[in-house]
């Protein structure tokens, strides 16, 4: 029988903020307001694709866990070996799974380190590395703004003439640098400007998502749904008035209801006493406001063996990133969106060996490939949508990544 590989989790004293600890060796992150997990080095990584990708991911993760001997003196969510995941939007595209060699976690002032191997506890950086600013050249994406508006108009016609109720159309922009792009400076900037979002990085996909697709913690399930958006002006009084108008907007409330319904329906078979608030709240971010609803529930006792992969298969794609009905919306996206989404709008986050974890939807993000960055934004299209307004909304959703690069 092969010898098991040791995995050790130990408490930490004071250290640099999580995002300042990262070396340049394939960083992975999931950080919100300073708390979360960061990791580096690759103990194991693989990719999955196809209709059985969530099941294939589960099998691979469990195969890796069978090779490990875990010594964990901290015993909270996020300790022990951690799987970082980034699933594609479309099953036919590649999804990535990464188990880092070293993970540092922090929650409510307590922190820990996990490392794989029989070496001594790794030493952490004691001073933040100075990262140089890069120069970027911006270009159009797969479609020009005008071409994208034409596709939005096509989608509206489809909604008005078929059973389709809502579809999410995304667009991209391409950015080039004269050298390989270092994600760490971008991640720090995103965290500073958008501390209430989840700052993620997995295999070159980096971003700041405001949308928590799934949190599993000791049998409790949470999903935050965002749909319905309005840009901020920077004037507090004006923004309060805009927030009130967003909360009354029939178009945005309709779009939001589709998204909430799709998540609640997906969770219902697994949960008892699912809580769906009657009306959404307005979530204020640095540059936009969203209608938001937190859907919560407790796993049915007989379903305690259900894991995140099972629930993700039912949750994704939700109406917030695809549409309603799902199959009709997914087909229209494939027909008219004009680009591969890759891992944009797919589940991204982490799981631990207990089955606890947090996964968001990969929004407000970009994919780094050496010296190129491709950033994404999507808009929910319903019968009352206007192509020009949707273009404006998409530009607002590009703002976090644009700002993080400046």
Locate each region found by the language model.
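Contiguous alpha-helical scaffold segments within structured protein domains
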Residues: 1-14, 20, 27, 32-57, ...
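A short, Trp-centered hydrophobic/proline-enriched beta-strand micro-motif
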Residues: 25-32, 82-84, 165-167, 195-201
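Short coil/turn segments at secondary-structure boundaries
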Residues: 32, 165-170, 200-204, 279, ...
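An anion-binding catalytic pocket shared by soluble metabolic enzymes
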Residues: 39-47, 94-102, 111, 171-258, ...
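Non-catalytic accessory segments adjacent to catalytic cores
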Residues: 60-176, 271-272, 403-406
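A residue-level signal for conserved active-site and pocket-lining positions in enzyme catalytic cores
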Residues: 85, 104, 162, 214, ...
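Short, solvent-exposed loop/turn elements at beta->coil junctions and helix N-caps
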Residues: 88, 202-204, 348-352
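Conserved hydrophobic core element of enzyme catalytic domains
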Residues: 294-406
């Amino acid at each position: 029988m092969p010898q098991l590989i040791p995995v050790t989790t130990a408490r930490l004293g004071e250290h640099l903020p999580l995002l300042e600890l990262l070396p340049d060796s394939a960083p992975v992150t999931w950080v919100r307001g300073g708390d979360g997990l960061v990791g580096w080095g690759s103990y194991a990584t693989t990719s999955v694709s196809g209709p059985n990708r969530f099941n294939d991911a589960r099998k691979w993760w469990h195969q890796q866990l069978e090779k490990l001997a875990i010594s964990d003196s901290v015993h909270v969510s996020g300790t022990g070996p951690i799987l970082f995941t980034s699933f594609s939007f479309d099953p036919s595209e590649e999804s990535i799974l990464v188990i880092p060699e070293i993970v540092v976690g922090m929650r409510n002032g307590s922190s820990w380190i996990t490392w794989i191997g029989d070496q001594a506890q790794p030493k952490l950086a004691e001073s933040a590395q100075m990262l140089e600013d890069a120069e970027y050249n911006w270009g159009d994406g797969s479609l020009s703004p005008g071409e994208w508006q034409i596709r939005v108009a096509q989608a509206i016609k489809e909604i008005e003439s078929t059973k389709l109720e809502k579809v999410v159309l995304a667009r991209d922009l391409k950015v080039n640098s004269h050298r390989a792009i270092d994600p760490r400076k971008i991640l720090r900037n995103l965290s500073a400007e958008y501390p209430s979002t989840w700052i993620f990085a997995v295999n070159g996909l980096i971003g700041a998502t405001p949308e928590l697709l799934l949190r599993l913690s000791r049998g409790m399930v949470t999903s935050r749904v965002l749909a319905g958006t309005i840009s901020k002006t920077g004037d507090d009084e004006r923004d309060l008035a805009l927030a009130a108008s967003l909360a009354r907007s029939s178009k945005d409330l309709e779009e939001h209801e589709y998204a909430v319904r799709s998540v609640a329906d997906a969770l219902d078979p697994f949960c008892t006493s699912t809580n769906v608030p009657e009306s959404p709240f307005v979530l204020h971010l640095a540059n936009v406001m969203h209608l938001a609803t937190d859907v919560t529930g407790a796993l049915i006792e007989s379903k305690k063996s259900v894991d995140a992969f099972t629930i993700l298969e039912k949750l994704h794609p939700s109406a917030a990133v695809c549409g309603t009905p799902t199959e009709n919306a997914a087909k229209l996206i494939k027909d008219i969106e004009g680009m591969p989404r890759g891992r944009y709008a797919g589940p991204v986050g982490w799981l631990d060996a207990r089955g606890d974890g947090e996964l968001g939807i990969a929004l407000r993000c970009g994919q780094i490939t050496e010296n190129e960055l491709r950033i994404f934004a999507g808009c929910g299209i319903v019968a009352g949508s206007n192509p020009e307004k949707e273009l404006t909304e998409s530009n607002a959703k590009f703002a976090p990544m644009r700002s993080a690069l400046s």
